[in-house]
Amino acid sequence: MISVIKSLLTLSVLSTLAAAKFESATPPIEVVGNKFYYSNNGTQFLLRGIAYQQDTSGSVSNGYDSDPNRKYNDPLADADACKRDVQYFIDTNTNTLRVYGIDPDKDHEECMKIFSDAGIYVIADLSEPTVSVNRINPEWNLDLYERYTKVIDNMQEYSNVLGFFAGNEVTNNRTNTDASPFVKAAVRDMKKYIKDNDYRTIPVGYSSNDDEDTRVAIADYFACGSLDDRADFFGINMYEWCGRSTFATSGYKDRTEDFKNLTIPIFFSEYGCNEVSPRVFQEVGTLYSDQMTDVWSGGIVYMYYEEANHYGLVSLNGDRVSTLADYNNYKSAIKSISPSLARRSTIQSEDSTKTMACPDNSHSTWRASTELPPTPDEEFCDCISQSFNCVVADDVDAEDYSTLFGEVCGYIDCGDISANGNTGEYGGFSFCSDKDRLSYVLNQYYHDQNERADACDFAGSASINDNASASTSCSAAGGRGLQSGRRSSTTRGGSSSSRSSSSSSSSSTGSGSSNAGIKVGGGQMSTVKLITITTIVTAFVGGLSIIFY
């Protein structure tokens, strides 16, 4: 009992320290069991949302955008637009906006205040079009960690931040379920970051597509495990109800049955099929009816602005907004709902912390490991990199790294810099920057060749580091460590020198064929090493799969 009282007092103190702006107008939303509640009165919160961002083609439903020049419009940094649009949200009883890309270097206070005064919350994606987990070659690395934490730092002070998405449709079919451990690691680390910085508790979740093969397994995957690791909520981009339909024939009944036992809130993170135009939004009445509200927490209509995809509720000509038929139909539908709302006081204590078993990853449709990638650790990467005697030359362009990775990994085992979401094997240096990872393997090769002068050249792409520090031991968060300086080619920890278990996810050649070799630059390279190289190289060529057979 004493420990419980101490915990409650600690939470009370932290709550006081982490008081957010605009709480009187928009009290923080909290997660209890499988529902959202207003923190001030314990009434259930159902999302009545609209997706709010122009030109989101690079951040919506693509999972990853390799175009480094793509720009995105941050709608929460444009106060004039927020003032212009807020009345259209008020008129549709909107209480949630989904924003797909936040610029963490911009100020968002004026827009957040405008929306708070209107009782509107924001749920924001932590990624942006070119900085997100790539479903083809997934990583959870320092660049992503820095991007995600900067968004949290920028937005955490506003009480009307409902939550953050750590990913959107990253895994979108059975062929890329290995990407999910990297997104779940992002969920885990962002929850810990929020807690470690004494920010108020802000939910972190995931937004998925509605893929028939993976829809149930991926929801269970993000909801399973410890409270520290699991997602706080789960969104599904749902486009099954088109035109006029019913709860039973649309697929909504089946989906409600699929997720009735999910232990975290689930909602439509996008909805509004446009196969029939204009959209009549008949599904709105069902979504907020007793048939669904015990399982579902509402939804977010896709989308506010009319774009080439014709999902818009309004059109924009210069700064002039014109409502479309979709807007008027949605307005009529959403203003007609009268949902029954649950009360937090009725939730049993054991239900509020209930978790679930993780899905079996031995099936062909779900292969994601429950072992998650390590937390990116900048100090660890810096510690190791300072000891490299051979490094990539500063004048080598990042787009040329793939060629060097392919060459050097033909000579040595690159397990320490690679990661496999199917087997749950993550090299101890896999989360560091591309430049540091390349220098790591160049340095390893240099020492394996007994520091021959020509072993640190690679046609001028590598050079001797005269300022290398003395060999020392570096440890990463969670106890992972690597020996800096000179080291053998045998990998450490969970990564065996043969990397034999890594082949199961990308090739039918197993350990029995690991001795088969291919000559590369005068060296013998095993088939298993070849698979590792393929995984590394494809990360630098925008999704092009390179097969060396």
UniProtKB/Swiss-Prot annotation:
Q: Which residues are glycosylated?
A: 41, 173, 261, 467
UniProt biased composition (Low complexity): 484-514
Give me the Gene Ontology terms describing cellular component. Answer: plasma membrane; side of membrane
Localization annotation: Cell membrane
Any one GO BP annotation for this protein? fungal-type cell wall organization
Q: Which GO molecular function annotation, any one, does this entry have?
A: 1,3-beta-glucanosyltransferase activity
Q: Which SMART domains match?
A: X8 (SM00768)
Name the InterPro entries on file. Glucanosyltransferase, Glycoside_hydrolase_SF, X8
Q: Which UniProt keywords apply?
A: Cell membrane, Disulfide bond, Glycoprotein, GPI-anchor, Lipoprotein, Membrane, Signal
Cite the Pfam families for this sequence: Glyco_hydro_72, X8
Endpoints of the signal sequence = 1-20
Cite the residue spans of the region called Disordered: 470-518
**Which residues are connected by disulfide bridges in this protein?**
82-111, 224-358, 242-273, 381-432, 390-456, 409-414
SUPFAM superfamilies assigned to the protein according to its UniProt record, in alphabetical order: (Trans)glycosidases (SSF51445)
What family classification does the UniProt entry report for this protein? Belongs to the glycosyl hydrolase 72 family.
Q: What is this protein called?
A: Protein EPD2
Lineage, top ranks: Eukaryota, Fungi, Dikarya, Ascomycota, Saccharomycotina
The gene is EPD2
